[in-house]
Amino acid sequence: MKNWKQYLPDILAVLLFAVISFAYFFPADIDGKVLYRHDSSAGRGMGLESSEYYDRTGEVTRWTGSVFCGMPTYQITPRYKSLTALTDVVDIYHLGLPENVWFLFVYLLGFYIMLRAFNFKTYLAALGSVVWAFSSYFLIIIAAGHLWKVMALAYLPPMIGGIVLAYRGKYLWGLFVTSLFTAFEIYANHVQMT
């Protein structure tokens, strides 16, 4: 029982992050409103040809002729069988929260993990996470639809936190956290940010 109680402040912080994330996007979540994101809409348009090809043939194409007179699809509509297992792990990390909510939640949680790796007290790590997550740029890129950038920036702090854990002698935790969030970074598919 004693071991469980030592993690209670961290568990409460994670729950607080979920509540904050829901509260911020409350009107949209309750009313079923959708945030129009230009880049997401344009991305769906760019990937339409390859999606239609997949629906028609069941095969994944690695080339599209609909963008820039032809280009590879690995940046537009990536489909790899190897992503299936990682997608499940990413979904668990997002706690199954609705789309806009989990964007903010992973900003909060990721920075919290990093600050805890730096041995910040729970309340300071939680406060720092709120300040970081609500910086204007992070909310602007959600609204703009730079969703892969959102993911890449959200997974970067915990990846750094894993490296810090390894430097502090917590080698297994450091390896696990760094490996997990490095995989998430690659999964985010945003080369410039990763």
State each model region's role.
Residues P157-P158, V164:
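Membrane-embedded translocation segments of transport machinery
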Residues F17, S129, A133, T178-S179, ...:
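Small-residue faces within membrane-embedded alpha-helices
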